[in-house]
Design a protein with these regions (language model features):
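Glycine-rich phosphate- or other oxyanion-binding loops that anchor nucleotides, phosphorylated ligands
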Residues: 20-214
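Short, conserved "active-site rim" segments that organize catalytic pockets and cofactor/ligand binding
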Residues: 1-12
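Nucleotide and nucleotide-moiety/phosphate-recognizing core
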Residues: 15
Length: 214
């Protein structure tokens, strides 16, 4: 979303904006590194489109996915940042067709996709789906079955695109709301400012993850 990208855009220099497939793309430098920010929009299809634009049009050799997300257990805290080690799409289900676990893509043998990690932050498992809700059924699926720590609406789709393209993908999520602590919608809006302050503070470290040379 635009508001999630704003702290990043404020830190960029030599900015030049264009559009691909209706998505805002801002190229420039960030802490001395050439970067491009693709503002995807909400949801898995938007996220996949944005990742493919970065890879095909911008020739990205690495993807950094940044954003706020919901926490699912006591192992995460509001306003804190976490790195994603594995991501699954919890609303993708071929169980009835082939007996695979929920979230297992047709081209994969397991449901969680591994991501590239820098090890600068605590590692967590992410569940992605096109829903923002307080559904008890979703919560049971995410925690009891998938054992996820964090939920969002984009990360798993970006991981899938990067897997097929062979492009390393780092994902960093800042917790805006916690399941079981009242309305996640109210928490989300109340805690956005705190999340953006965390992003500003940690942005240089995050960008450094994508500039480490082998």
């Amino acid at each position: 979303m635009d508001k999630e990208a704003e702290p990043i855009l404020q830190a960029m220099a030599k900015k030049k904006e264009t559009k691909y497939c209706g998505k805002r793309v801002i190229c420039g430098t960030l802490f001395g590194e050439k970067v491009a920010v693709v503002i995807c929009g909400v949801g898995k299809v938007n996220a996949a489109c944005g990742a493919q634009i970065a890879i095909d049009k911008l020739k990205a050799t690495l993807i950094l996915n940044l954003g706020v997300a919901g926490g699912l257990n006591a192992g995460v805290k509001v306003g804190e940042i976490y790195e994603i080690s594995h991501a699954v799409q919890y609303d993708f289900d071929l169980t009835q067709l082939n007996g695979t676990e929920i979230g297992t893509l047709d081209e994969c043998k397991t449901n969680y996709l591994p991501l590239t990690v820098c090890g600068k932050y605590p590692l967590k498992k992410l569940a992605t789906g096109d829903r923002f809700n307080d559904s008890p059924a979703d919560y049971a699926l995410l925690t009891n079955i998938l054992k996820a720590d964090i939920r969002d609406m984009e990360g798993g789709a970006i991981a899938q695109v990067c897997m097929h393209a062979g492009v390393p993908c780092f994902e960093f999520k800042i917790i805006s709301d916690l399941a079981g602590s009242g309305s996640t919608t109210e928490q989300y809006f109340s805690n956005l400012g705190l999340c953006f302050e965390t992003l500003k503070r940690e942005l240089k470290t995050i960008v450094a993850a994508g500039t480490v040379k082998d």
